[in-house]
A protein has these predicted regions:
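Acidic-basic catalytic patches of nuclease active cores, encompassing PD-(D/E)XK
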Residues: 2-59
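Short amphipathic alpha-helical segments and their helix-coil junctions
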Residues: 4-23, 180-199, 282-284
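Conserved S-adenosyl-L-methionine
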Residues: 317-346
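Nucleic-acid nuclease catalytic cores
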Residues: 102-151
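Short, hydrophobic/amphipathic alpha-helical patches that form generic packing surfaces
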Residues: 36-43, 207-219
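Long recognition/docking surfaces used for binding and targeting
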Residues: 213, 217-308
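Structural motif
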Residues: 27-33, 195-209, 273, 292-295
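Active-site metal-binding core of divalent-cation-utilizing nuclease and nuclease-like domains
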Residues: 24-27, 50-91
Length: 346
């Protein structure tokens, strides 16, 4: 999901597109970039290219259906070429997945509630899945009926089944979580959740450090047991109660702070002061992310963002960019047993 290299987007379904990867600001990705990434992900899960329908009409409204509700794409249980009409009922009768893509996470809950969930309500089959994809969150939605009551459930991307199989809720493992392009954006979203929960800035950064150390501790614990369930999970999607979730996560926090505490500049509490609902929302973002395999520049950018706030350091300088470091190492070509030092002399 990187923005490096050629700025042209090549879609597995439509070929090379006229839209670039980057938006007008030159820094962030376009919505089309994320749509193609979602398509590539599903193809990697065995969903046939010929079964994709780009921008299908999901519902028609108004006089003679003049207004329409579209999704970014749908995956059908038959080749799209076999559907001779663009009528919503014909498409929805074969829809396996309906996807909505956004370029950022700013209105994620609004989009989920007004676009993704209604798409599932319009679906003809109970087995149809909804997919939400943005720069931070990738979530799958499905319908469950219990005692005649329908409920739309939500879970991490790892729940998406291979083509032809039903959805199955399985715990996250070290081998199923993935690094992200921006830890900064991920933790800014977590900071926003804490802000909405009325935590002051200083307390928010303390909680973020607790969460970061706990996540790293958990990943290291399961790195050599890659197929065993992690202790930091998207517990709501697994049907775990809020009280049980708080206890499970709280136990890991205590062990993590005990392990890392003596290496921290300041004493850090080993009690996480979060309500069940707030913890659920944070775990939804944090649990699917693999931090310890993130690239150096991703970790560096994150560190410079949050370390200053955590420890009130006056950082007048920035780390040497990793591109410069890599360039110099390539030129110097150190051999076994040799070391290169960056004296940080300004």
């Amino acid at each position: 999901m990187e923005l490096t290299g050629n700025l042209q987007i090549v879609c597995p379904i439509r070929g090379q597109l006229k839209v670039n990867k980057r938006s007008k600001d030159g820094l962030t990705a376009t919505e089309e970039f994320y749509r193609v990434e979602a398509i590539k992900f599903l193809i990697s899960k065995g969903y046939p290219k010929e079964n994709f329908w780009i921008e299908p009409i999901i519902k028609k409204f108004g006089n003679s259906g003049r207004n329409s509700f579209r999704s970014d794409f749908a995956v059908l249980d038959v080749p799209a070429s076999t559907i001779s009409t663009n009528e919503p009922d014909d498409i929805l009768g074969h829809a396996v997945i309906i996807c909505e893509v956004k370029r950022d996470n700013k209105k994620n809950e609004y989009v989920k509630n007004t676009q993704v969930k209604p798409m599932l309500d319009f679906a003809k089959k109970q087995s149809t899945l909804g997919l939400y994809w943005d720069n931070i969150e990738k979530r799958v939605f499905w319908i469950e009926v219990t005692d005649g009551i329908k409920e739309i459930k939500e879970g991490p991307l790892t729940f998406v089944p291979k083509f032809g199989l039903p959805i199955k809720t399985t715990p996250l493992t070290f081998n199923t979580i993935e690094p992200v392009d921006s830890l900064t954006e991920t933790f800014e979203r977590i900071e926003d959740i804490l802000h909405q929960a009325s935590f002051a800035p200083e307390k928010r950064y303390e909680i973020i450090l607790q969460l970061l150390l706990t996540k790293i501790f958990d990943e290291h614990a399961f790195e050599v047991r890659g197929d065993e369930p992690l202790e930091i999970q998207d517990y709501r999607s697994l049907g775990t109660s809020a009280d049980t979730t708080k206890k499970k996560v709280g136990d890991v926090v205590k062990r993590a702070i005990s392990f890392y505490g003596e290496h921290l500049p300041n004493k850090l509490s080993d009690t996480l002061p979060l309500s069940g609902d707030t913890l659920f929302e944070i775990l939804k973002i944090l649990a699917p992310v693999k931090i310890i395999h993130s690239k150096r520049d991703v970790v560096q950018t994150f560190y410079m963002k949050f370390a200053k706030a955590l420890y009130k350091w006056d950082m007048a300088q920035y780390f040497t960019p990793t591109t410069v470091t890599d360039f110099l190492v390539d030129i110097i070509n150190p051999q076994f047993g040799e070391h290169i030092a960056d004296p940080a002399c300004g």
